Amino acid sequence: MIPQVATLDFETKGIEARPVYPPKPVGCAIRLPGDRGSSYLAWGHPYENNIKEKDAKKILLDIIKNMPVLFHNASFDFSVGVEWLGWPVDTPWQNIHDTLFLAFLHDPRDRSLSLKPWADKYLGMPPDEQDELKAWILENVPGAHDHRGRKVKNPELFWGALISEAPGGLVGKYAKGDTDRTWEMFKYTWKRVIEEQGMLEGYNRERRNLRVFDGMSDEGIKVNRKLLGSDIKKYESRLSYLDKTICRKLGRTFDVGSGPQLADALDKADMMERWVLTPTGKRSTAKDNLIPNIRDQKLVNLLGERSTLVFYLSTFIKRWHEDSIGTDRIYPGFHQVRSTNEYGGGSSGARTGRPSSSNPNLLNVPKYKRVLEKPWGKNLPNI
């Protein structure tokens, strides 16, 4: 039998990285057991609000304390409730359902586990109200845009981050569509994943771990910024030495980090046995294509060390040092399953469902623990 749940979906201010997370809510869509449709409590929009924040808080607190609740991506919505509305952080896991987990168990190979694309594909519920809201924001909010990608200027002005700036009535139509989709998705996946495939144990495992993963993300990891800073100076000095040595070895001064310039220098010094070409016909300077074809072993060693050093400096050491400014902590997001940011593009989590992390990536656990500071009364594991 399908559990009777209250389906909830928060609309919030724009999402920022931890520790400035989760964002402040401006409204919440609700679909209670037995309801034929959803309602929307709007309290933080510029206009067309229908309830005071304190009254909405009482209603939502009563729901979370007295009945099971359903979200799509409970990690986000439950965190919003805990941070801003006083929800009990120790709410029993049995009372929190998540269609993101069910969608993953239904088919982890699906191109998208996001609510709207999934509901469109399996339930025939196209996101028409999203198009209406998007058009309003692009027309009425100065600077709003719909460009995706990591290199986009002013990502905070992406239309999906500005939903709180739209009128409560219009956002309510959009948000109610999401809770209706979530409830229909719950019924669809519960029948197929739980009743037909017997995967209740797997679903419950993900639910039990939900607050564990969120807790790790919220607490962050303390780092030794002083040591990181000295390491940056040391390894940047080593990188400069490697670049100068490589230039001397090849008989010319050039930017070793530039693929085309490195290829030209290797050619002129007659250091290549052969070139592996890219699909566009250019000489590939990717490590795996370059190293096996260089004639000089000392040059191979220099370029190999440089490649490793650049990777660790950019991916870990500098990133950790920058991200920990003001807090002495880094705040990676820990993920249970793959999920997609339906507004800004990109995804997090692993397709296989294994635990993963991002922003920054901590899958490569440091073997030497001197850069990490253990919390008081706790120990770091030996590796």
Predicted regions: what they are:
Residues 62, 79-83, 104, 117-121, ...:
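Residue-level signal for well-ordered alpha-helical scaffold segments within enzymatic catalytic domains
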Residues 88-108, 115-117:
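Conserved beta-strand -> loop -> alpha-helix junction used to position metal-binding or nucleic-acid-contacting
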Residues 77-81, 112-115, 128-131:
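Switch/connector loops and helix/strand junctions flanking conserved nucleotide-binding motifs
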Residues 18, 28, 75-88, 102-106, ...:
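Short active-site loop/helix that positions an aromatic residue
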Residues 1-30, 37-38, 110, 120-127, ...:
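Conserved "right-hand" nucleotidyltransferase catalytic core of DNA-directed polymerases
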Residues 1-5, 10-78, 82-83:
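Conserved non-catalytic scaffold segment of RNase H-like nuclease domains
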Residues 7-8, 72, 96-101, 382-383:
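Conserved catalytic palm subdomain of right-hand nucleotidyl-transferase polymerases, strongest
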